[in-house]
Amino acid sequence: MTEADSSVLQIWGGHPLQGHVKISGAKNSALVIMAGALLCSGDCRIRNVPLLADVERMGEVISALGVRLTRQADIIDINASEIKTSKAPYELVTQLRASFFAIGAILARLGVAQMPLPGGCAIGARPVDLHVRGLQAMGAEVQIEHGICNAYVPGSGGRLKGAKIYLDTPSVGATETLMMAATLADGETILENAAREPEVVDLANFCKAMGANIQGAGTSTITIVGVPKLHSVDYSIIPDRIEAGTFLVAGAITRSEITLSSVVPEHLIPLIAKLRDIGVTIIEESPDCLRILPAEILKATDIDTLPHPGFPTDMQAPFMALLTLAEGDSIINESVFENRLRHASELNRLGADIRVKGNTAFVRGVPLLSGAPVIGTDLRASAALVIAGLAAEGKTTIQGLHHLDRGYDQIDVKLQQLGAKILRVREEPANAEVAVNNNVSPASIST
C-alpha cells in the first residue's frame, strides 16, 4: 500500500484563503512530452515537470524500455539513443492511460511496438480505436489480442507512411499519438478534426524544437511532414491550466483574494468566463498572473463540457462543488465522458443538493455545506471534494488520495501556504481522529 493509499486529508473549512500560489507544469503535457522524447536519439531535457504519481509512473514505463532517465527537482533528462525493447510492461501501462500514447513514438523509432491497453481514471469508455485506425492508415499492421496491442510496419525499412487521417472525434490522445508517429514517417500526414487543446500544441512545439515539421497545431487540421531523425532539445512545458482552474475555484468558493502566477490566461478563457458569469472578479495582473477577488454573491449558471476551446471536462467536478453554494438552480451537462458525475453523491454527503440523470447534474444551491467523511472516486472528483471541504463548516475527511496525487503537485501544501486548515494524515480514517487530537489542533496548523 502506498502512502497516498493509507492517507486521508482532513480539512477544517470555512476559512478564507489569502496569498500567492505558483502553478506547476501541466500534467497532461508532461506525460505525452516524456513519450515524445522517445522520438529523439539524443538528449532531451524537460523542464517545469510537476511532482506527480502519474509522472513517476510514466518514467517507470520509459525506463522499462531500456531508456536512460534521470530526474532532479522539476527537470527530467531522457536519452533514448538506444531503446532496448519495444514491449512496454503490462503492470505499468494498465495503471496509466497516457503511457499508451507512446506507441506512436515507439513504432516510429523501431517499426514495431507492443503496448498493453491503458488504464487510469475509471471515468467511462475511452477506447483506442482512433489510435489504431490512424496507425493502420500510416501502413502499420495492428492487432489487439488478450488486452495487448501489437503493431509493426511491414517491409525492410520499417518506416510509417504519411496519410490523410480524419478523426471521428477530436480525441486528444489519438491526435498526440498520431502526431508523434508522423514526425518520422515517410511523407506528409494530415490530421483532420484534430484536438485543439493547449497540451497538443505543447507537444507539437516540443517536437518542432527537436526538428519536426508540424503546422497547424491548435487548429482542427494538423499537417506533419516526416523527417529522418530528430535532435536533442531543452524544453520547458506549459503551466497546468486545470490546476490553475482548481485554485481559482477554491478562491471563489471560499470568498478569497489570491494571486496565481505561472499561468496562461488564454488557456483559461472558458473557465474565467463562467467564473465572471456567476459573479467572481478576476483580474489579469500580467501576462502570466491572475488575481481573484471575493464575490458577494455566487449566482447559478449552466455548463456544457466540450473539447477545447469549450469548457473543459476536467473542470466539471471542481465547478460543480462551487455551484453547490450558488444562489439558484444550475444544470451541468457532461458531454465528453460518460460516468463522470460520481462525485455528486459525495458532495451530497456534505449537504449539497444535486440530482443526477444520465450525464446531466441538476444542482440546487444551498446556504452552507457541512463537513463529513467522503471518498474521491477519480482525480477531478477528489479535487472537487477538497474544494467543497474548504468551504464546508466543520471537518471534512477525504479518502482516495491516490487519485488526487496522480494530478496535483502537493495541493495540500499549496493550500496550507494560502492559509487553509488542511492536514494529510498517514493513518486509516478510524485512527486519524486520534492522531490529530494527540498531535495537532486545527488552530495550530501552519499557515
From Swiss-Prot:
Q: What is the E.C. number?
A: 2.5.1.7
Cell cycle keyword on record? yes
Q: Does the keyword Cell cycle apply?
A: yes
* Major subcellular location class: cytoplasm
Spell out the GO cellular component terms annotated for this protein, sorted alphabetically and separated by semicolons: cytoplasm
Catalytic activity reported: phosphoenolpyruvate + UDP-N-acetyl-alpha-D-glucosamine = UDP-N-acetyl-3-O-(1-carboxyvinyl)-alpha-D-glucosamine + phosphate
Modification 2-(S-cysteinyl)pyruvic acid O-phosphothioketal occurs at:
121
Q: Which CDD domains does the annotation name?
A: UdpNAET
Q: Which InterPro entries match?
A: Enolpyruvate_Tfrase_dom, Enolpyruvate_Tfrase_sf, MurA_subfamily, RNA3'P_cycl/enolpyr_Trfase_a/b, UDP_GlcNAc_COvinyl_MurA
Tell where it localizes: Cytoplasm
Q: Name one Pfam family in it.
A: EPSP_synthase
- Annotated residues that bind phosphoenolpyruvate are located at 27-28
A GO biological process of this protein is:
UDP-N-acetylgalactosamine biosynthetic process
Protein's pathway: Cell wall biogenesis; peptidoglycan biosynthesis
State one molecular function term (GO).
UDP-N-acetylglucosamine 1-carboxyvinyltransferase activity
- The residues that the entry says bind UDP-N-acetyl-alpha-D-glucosamine are 97, 126-130, 314, 336
Q: Which domain of life is it from?
A: Bacteria
Top enzyme class, one word, equals transferase
Q: What does this protein do?
A: Cell wall formation. Adds enolpyruvyl to UDP-N-acetylglucosamine.
- HAMAP family reported in the protein's UniProt record: MurA
Family statement: Belongs to the EPSP synthase family. MurA subfamily.
Q: What is this protein called?
A: UDP-N-acetylglucosamine 1-carboxyvinyltransferase
- Please name the source species: Nostoc sp. (strain PCC 7120 / SAG 25.82 / UTEX 2576)
Gene of this entry: murA
